[in-house]
């Protein structure tokens, strides 16, 4: 195959292989060498950060004033109950927010199926466990669900200095409908050319959006963002940009850079958490199991991460990166 210097191959086919109802592999080929990583990284970042979704942002529980309370007859404490509510997969139709209610008498499990929903709200994981009641237990609560994008801390919803209402428990919201996404670039061949790329995107959603539709939305967002460059005037000087690394540099920094309290920092080091990339992969539940790390320290860690655009429970592909050698870890550990 012969080609001119200005000729670029464009993908001839896109293939979607459904793995389950919520996960799929998307295969795109052939691509010019290097375009697999270019497109794969851009789509992955958009999928994780920019697709709209819904999440529980506020909870009112009868008889409970704050998240550190307990409810008689409820097996879980309120913090664990709130964490379980974050696992609800909710779809809102033609609205930005909605209110759900729940009333239950024990004994038995409280699941998402027990929620009373408005006509324009759907919970796609009705079997999701929220809590467990004993024979003498009962619960009555109201949930506020909002639409959004990315990750939003509860503090960001209140202007500085504004007092939060007592009894209305605020939750950090992860709106993204994407649970997991990664990509690989394999070799592809067209006739005699073997220096081509094949892009394979592997993704899993929370069920509120079809994997194929998620890819379509991400590609549309990318197209809209770069369309302006097509009409770029010739007399406009191009702006040089430094290439971005696969791994965000902030993830390679030691946790000491977060300037946590001595107690929090020592608890993390005791769990072999030396780098910010190590920390963001831990969940709230995992950190609460750390000896001497209480809910106050957890709140401090979450707030510091949020100020840097990070959160707990992130999934990082290929961590630790090759640039973070084992001897670097040993050197840091010996400080």
Swiss-Prot record:
Residues 247-335 are annotated as: Alpha C-terminal domain (alpha-CTD). Keywords: DNA-directed RNA polymerase, Nucleotidyltransferase, Transcription, Transferase. One of its GO terms (cellular component) is cytoplasm. One of its GO terms (biological process) is DNA-templated transcription. One of its GO terms (molecular function) is DNA-directed RNA polymerase activity. Its EC number is 2.7.7.6. It is an enzyme of class 2 (transferase). HAMAP family: RNApol_bact_RpoA. NCBIfam families: PRK05182.1-2, PRK05182.2-5, rpoA. This is DNA-directed RNA polymerase subunit alpha.
């Amino acid at each position: 195959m012969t080609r001119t210097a200005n000729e670029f191959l464009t993908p001839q086919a896109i293939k979607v292989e459904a793995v389950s109802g919520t996960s799929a592999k998307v295969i795109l080929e052939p691509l010019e060498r290097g375009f697999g990583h270019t497109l794969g990284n851009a789509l992955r970042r958009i999928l994780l950060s920019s697709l709209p979704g819904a999440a529980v942002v506020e909870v009112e529980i009868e008889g409970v004033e704050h998240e550190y309370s307990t409810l008689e007859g409820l097996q879980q404490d309120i913090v664990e109950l709130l964490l379980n509510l974050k696992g609800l997969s909710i779809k809102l139709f033609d609205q930005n927010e909605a209110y759900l209610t729940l009333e239950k008498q024990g004994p038995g499990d409280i699941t998402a199926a027990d929620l009373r929903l408005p006509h324009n709200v759907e919970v796609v994981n009705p079997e999701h466990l929220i809590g467990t009641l004993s024979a003498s237990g009962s619960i009555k609560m109201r949930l506020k669900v909002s639409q959004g994008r990315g990750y939003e801390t509860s503090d960001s919803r209140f202007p500085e200095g504004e007092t939060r209402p007592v009894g209305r428990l605020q939750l950090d919201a992860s709106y993204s409908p994407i649970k997991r996404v990664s990509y690989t670039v394999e070799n592809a061949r067209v006739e005699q050319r073997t220096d081509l790329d094949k892009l394979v995107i592997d993704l899993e959603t929370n069920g509120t959006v079809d994997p194929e539709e998620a890819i379509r939305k991400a590609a549309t967002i990318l197209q809209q963002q770069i369309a302006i460059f097509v009409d770029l005037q010739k007399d406009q000087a191009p702006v040089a940009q430094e290439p971005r690394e696969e791994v965000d540099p902030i993830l390679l920094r030691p946790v000491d850079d977060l300037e946590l309290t001595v107690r929090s920092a020592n608890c993390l080091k005791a769990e072999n958490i030396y780098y910010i990339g190590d920390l963001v992969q831990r969940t709230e539940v995992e950190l609460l199991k750390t000896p001497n790390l209480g809910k106050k320290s957890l709140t401090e860690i979450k707030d510091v991460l949020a100020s840097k655009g990070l959160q707990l429970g992130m999934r990082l592909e290929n961590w630790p990166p090759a640039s973070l050698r084992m001897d670097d870890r040993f050197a840091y550990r010996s400080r």
